[in-house]
Amino acid sequence: MPPRPSSGELWGIHLMPPRILVECLLPNGMIVTLECLREATLVTIKHELFKEARKYPLHQLLQDESSYIFVSVTQEAEREEFFDETRRLCDLRLFQPFLKVIEPVGNREEKILNREIGFVIGMPVCEFDMVKDPEVQDFRRNILNVCKEAVDLRDLNSPHSRAMYVYPPNVESSPELPKHIYNKLDKGQIIVVIWVIVSPNNDKQKYTLKINHDCVPEQVIAEAIRKKTRSMLLSSEQLKLCVLEYQGKYILKVCGCDEYFLEKYPLSQYKYIRSCIMLGRMPNLMLMAKESLYSQLPIDSFTMPSYSRRISTATPYMNGETATKSLWVINSALRIKILCATYVNVNIRDIDKIYVRTGIYHGGEPLCDNVNTQRVPCSNPRWNEWLNYDIYIPDLPRAARLCLSICSVKGRKGAKEEHCPLAWGNINLFDYTDTLVSGKMALNLWPVPHGLEDLLNPIGVTGSNPNKETPCLELEFDWFSSVVKFPDMSVIEEHANWSVSREAGFSYSHTGLSNRLARDNELRENDKEQLRALCTRDPLSEITEQEKDFLWSHRHYCVTIPEILPKLLLSVKWNSRDEVAQMYCLVKDWPPIKPEQAMELLDCNYPDPMVRSFAVRCLEKYLTDDKLSQYLIQLVQVLKYEQYLDNLLVRFLLKKALTNQRIGHFFFWHLKSEMHNKTVSQRFGLLLESYCRACGMYLKHLNRQVEAMEKLINLTDILKQEKKDETQKVQMKFLVEQMRQPDFMDALQGFLSPLNPAHQLGNLRLEECRIMSSAKRPLWLNWENPDIMSELLFQNNEIIFKNGDDLRQDMLTLQIIRIMENIWQNQGLDLRMLPYGCLSIGDCVGLIEVVRNSHTIMQIQCKGGLKGALQFNSHTLHQWLKDKNKGEIYDAAIDLFTRSCAGYCVATFILGIGDRHNSNIMVKDDGQLFHIDFGHFLDHKKKKFGYKRERVPFVLTQDFLIVISKGAQEYTKTREFERFQEMCYKAYLAIRQHANLFINLFSMMLGSGMPELQSFDDIAYIRKTLALDKTEQEALEYFTKQMNDAHHGGWTTKMDWIFHTIKQHALN
């Protein structure tokens, strides 16, 4: 039940005509036709309707108009009651211009809330009510407890707790200031400007303070009070009393945005302050009364929805009301019967026969050999065949799944047979109540994803495709005399103890077992060294069978090396209940590991629910809100690998989202951006519903953001489809005319930026908005900053809205660059990366932050005349920087260019970022270089005539080297070039030390469906660029060679840039 695509203001019509005839059915049976303005509100329409109704028969049967509401059928084919009569006709998304007048019945407040939730998540809430699956019903009820706990937590110390939810402190994870940042201070002190509003006319007064960087906000406020009262000539005792009385009544706010310093963190731990120190700017803070902030905060109420009181439809055995037996008392092998298939659409002339391929998997690992059915003609896909698997039922692990696909086979004479998957599906062998599946089942299959190389898709989603017109496979599982349940932990522990004692009785010469018997009592020093070496191997490094045996035989010692857990779990034979039971006992008491290591246990290789719960407990214990925000994209993605709707990871993320509005904001958009994806629309939709029910008044802000995005989607659809052949001038005229319409002005002004909820988007500056020249017609939009102190941060906010480009890859690349920047900063490397804001908000729809005062290399080169544009003058860029940064600031600009160039050289090389040309490398006026448009990474570079167009590992042209060497002709012989190389080497080795983190982050994204991130083979490119099979010295030599290739091969890049420039000029 995915959301339907937007189709405009009426079904199949992007924009209603300015005036439209609306058919209105009254309660007395009369139909009245009204001519309405497209932007008319429902209250206006109702008033006009009842005036007109007086001219019709039976009007005396009507009550007062306030007794009624409108109802109609929307484009989602849903009947919707319109309680909010301020809504405009054009925003109702009607199927046809028809309105019915009714008397409202039922719980008005709940219906209004359900409509708002349905609008923001993109699907009607009533669709969840119609789902009969007990797992869905139980999840919706049970997750409300998490919502209630979070809301209670927000109100714990009201109103401070509420303020902490709405304006959570934006701080670094550690209070420690890196040495190179500390060195920018004057003996550990920082100059801060404190602003105070002194009159109703917003007159401002400022105080400049010099304070220790580790002062907490209250100390800064106290110092501001002392400075403000200096002219009052108070005695020291009076001053002390004054400070004590007032310092707790004020708070600090960042001038220009909605960031507040509400907690007792050191000043330099706040991100805004740390950024000012790094950039050499004076922080501007506003002193405001705490009560004025608290009085603005909404008091959220949380009401349990009516479905929370419904009786569960779970069957008696699910509720524990019938006799059950343990999985471990079954004494038979697993078998499954394949009955028949329907809706299998194939071309009979191209395909000889079809068959069903099946396998039992644990994550991506097969638990036994795959088994195929007989081949049958396409015209009669019936098998009625029992398939037997080489695994006993008691040996099935908790996360076991049946993977199936209908495959075609085509054979030509004398040629090898071609096997091709037509559709696939997966089924959990245990349901959400730990019960083994049994009986008959119909499974609607999924279309084969792009890039699937195997016949099965074991890490794909489990469950049936909601689209019932897809191929459907009917199958049957064995019935048992009682309901079969996976054993509980007490039984598992008992079995583990038994298997350990039994193992102790084996002699080490026992056939087939000697390599895996526990040998912890024989551990030698070189064994310990080998274990430590295995622990440091990267996640993609293959572990041999001998190494797995070695790990398992020393499993008890491994507890003393907690971070070895992922490797030990990979060594478990998951088709052996003896080993699984022992592993469960080890995990139960395993020491916590760091969050970055725990995240590895959440990717597709670790499906076991106990292992994943352990990982989440580590995150709960050690993951700061800052780090959670940093890794949120991945943590949302790995929800796809959870077996069931209700799990610890869902509860952890939901609780964090409901107690920190900034996390909640991005949590919402990361989920909503995938609601078009049928494989996750139910899971993500249910999670969005629970978030929206408990996020309080922020739902109104999300409503405004979604409404604005819908308007922009509609506008850009018209530009791409109906206006694509018009001139730029005609398109711009249409854009401005539409944006001036009342409904567009209401929707597109006065809401929080989806890119950063601390930034308000005020009035649109229409004269500054434009349609960009690329094929997808992105919009360059410009809003005023309505903050009273906007001139101290930025006075306008520019954002690019894109409809038609998948921005998920850009978003991921920018996130990785941001993490690289953090690593470098913590190691004392200031490489001044610029990971600008980027957010995917839907299917190929997203927003990009515009970086102020920046220009593409091509724009700069074109300013140097024809020679510069055609790359014949390599000094154009250096001359432009000199002109922009005259006198003393020239050296600072060159230094900034050098640092940022070094950072991007290393980052683009490691990530294999392709399609680098002079239109997607930019430079700011102050010299900072940065890259944009990350449509190709992991070495998926553009090809021409079958060859990769880019022949160098990264971009380091003569133009850049001339800037780095301050205009020297023999740039490679200068001290500046040597310094640049040293920066690159240090940056490369710093990232190499954190290779596991980057591999894990990419591995967690495998379920995203990004075209260039389909398998572990894609991620292996990072292993190659970081030379993880080499020593550190060998890796440095490898990178040095890549650097030499880059600047010696710079002429090939220049040739590519020449052709790109010529092409762009031809297009324009």
Curated annotation (Swiss-Prot):
Pathway: Phospholipid metabolism; phosphatidylinositol phosphate biosynthesis
InterPro entries: ARM-type_fold, C2_domain_sf, Kinase-like_dom_sf, PI3/4_kinase_cat_dom, PI3/4_kinase_cat_sf, PI3/4_kinase_CS, PI3K-type_C2_dom, PI3K_ABD
CDD domains for this protein: C2_PI3K_class_I_alpha, PI3Ka_I, PI3Kc_IA_alpha
UniProt keyword terms in alphabetical order: Angiogenesis, ATP-binding, Kinase, Nucleotide-binding, Phagocytosis, Proto-oncogene, Serine/threonine-protein kinase, Transferase
Annotated region described as Catalytic loop, given as residue ranges: 912-920
Secreted recorded as keyword: no
Family: Belongs to the PI3/PI4-kinase family.
Protein name (record): Phosphatidylinositol 4,5-bisphosphate 3-kinase catalytic subunit alpha isoform
Species this chain originates from: Rattus norvegicus (Rat)
